Amino acid sequence: MSPCENDTPINWKRNLIVAWLGCFLTGAAFSLVMPFLPLYVEQLGVTGHSALNMWSGIVFSITFLFSAIASPFWGGLADRKGRKLMLLRSALGMGIVMVLMGLAQNIWQFLILRALLGLLGGFVPNANALIATQVPRNKSGWALGTLSTGGVSGALLGPMAGGLLADSYGLRPVFFITASVLILCFFVTLFCIREKFQPVSKKEMLHMREVVTSLKNPKLVLSLFVTTLIIQVATGSIAPILTLYVRELAGNVSNVAFISGMIASVPGVAALLLSAPRLGKLGDRIGPEKILITALIFSVLLLIPMSYVQTPLQLGILRFLLGAADGALLPAVQTLLVYNSSNQIAGRIFSYNQSFRDIGNVTGPLMGAAISANYGFRAVFLVTAGVVLFNAVYSWNSLRRRRIPQVSN
C-alpha cells in the first residue's frame, strides 16, 4: 500500500492531476525516440533506401499492432485487479523494454522489443478508465478532456527533446533517458494515485456476451469504437506525406524540415490550448454528442481546402484549426463511453477503444501512402475528408435516436 492510500475518501481531482502527469511522461517517453527511429534502424545494420524505408515502417507499426491485440486482455485484467495495478505494470514494463532497446544489437532484436513495447503498453487507456470511474458523471467531459492534454503535451515536447538529446549524446543514450522517464512515472503512480478497488475473481467476471448485454446501447458503443478508429485513420493518413507536401508547397528552401515540424505540431498546440478541456466542459453542459458531430463536420470543412492550398502558411493555419476540432473528438467519444457503460466494465471498454485506436494508427499511414503513390498528395486530403464525412453521418445516425440520460454526482 502506498503512503498516499488510507481510509480517507479518494480525491479524484488529485488523481486527475497525477494521472495527467503520468500521461504526459508516457507521451513524452514514446515520442522521444520517434525523430531518429530510421537513423537507429540504419545504425543496426539496415542499408539501402528501400530496405530502410521498409524496416522503419515495420518497426513503427508493429508497436500499435501488438497494442491492439493486447489491450482487451489488459482491460479485462484491470476490471479484475484494479486500474492502478495496470498503470504500474505498464510504466515499469515499458521502462524495462526501453533499456533493452538501447542495448539491441540487430534489427530483429529491435523489432521484437518494439512488439513487446506494444504488448506491455496501455497506460493511457487505463488512466482514462481510472478517472472515468472516479469523477462525477456530470464532469466526465471536462476531466477526460483535461486528461487527454497530458498525452498531447508529452507527444509535442518529446520529439524536440529527443532530437536535442540524440544530437548531444547519441542515439542509444536516449533510450536509457526514456526508460528513466518511465520509471519516474512508475513511482509517481505508485505513491500518489489512490484507488479503492475490490478484486473480482475470474468466475465473477462478466463474459463478453454479458459485457455487451450490460451496455445501455451496444450499437452506439460499437459506433464510438469505429469513430475512434476513423479519427486515427484521418490523422495518420496525412503523416507520411506531410513533409513531402510541405516541400512541394515551399519550393526550394533550406529549412523544409523545420517548416514541416512546425506544421506537424500546430494541431497538437491547438488541441492543448483551445479545445480539449474547454470543449469537454462545454460537452458536459450541452451534451458530448453535439460536440462530436460538430467537430466531425468542422474537420471535413477544413480537410477539403487543404487539398487546394498554395503555401505552407495556408496549410499551417488550416491544420491549427483542424487541431482545435480534433482535440474535442476523442474526449467526446470517451465521455459517451462513460455514459453508456458501468464502472464494472470500464477497463475493458476503454481497452477495446484503444484497440480500435491502434488499428487506426496502423491503417492510416498505409492508406495515405497508397493514395499519394497513385493519385498524388492532394488526393489524400480529399479521400480523408470523405472518410470523416462518412463517420459524421454514421455517428449522427447512431446518436439521433438516443437521448443522453440525466446524470448527477
Curated annotation (Swiss-Prot):
Q: From the Swiss-Prot or TrEMBL record, state where the protein is found.
A: Cell inner membrane
What is the membrane topology here? Answer: Multi-pass membrane protein
Give GO cellular component annotations, separated by semicolons: plasma membrane
One annotated GO molecular function is:
transmembrane transporter activity
Q: Does the keyword Cell membrane apply?
A: yes
Q: Name one Pfam family in it.
A: MFS_1
What keywords are annotated for this sequence in UniProt? Antibiotic resistance, Cell inner membrane, Cell membrane, Membrane, Transmembrane, Transmembrane helix, Transport
Residues spanning the membrane: 16-36, 58-78, 92-112, 115-135, 146-166, 173-193, 224-244, 256-276, 291-311, 379-399
Q: What does this protein do?
A: Confers resistance to fosfomycin and deoxycholate.
State the PANTHER family in the record: MULTIDRUG RESISTANCE PROTEIN MDTG
HAMAP family under this entry?
A: MFS_MdtG
Output the NCBIfam families linked to this UniProt entry: PRK09874.1
Tell me its family: Belongs to the major facilitator superfamily. DHA1 family. MdtG (TC 2.A.1.2.20) subfamily.
Name of the protein in its database record: Multidrug resistance protein MdtG
Gene (UniProt): mdtG
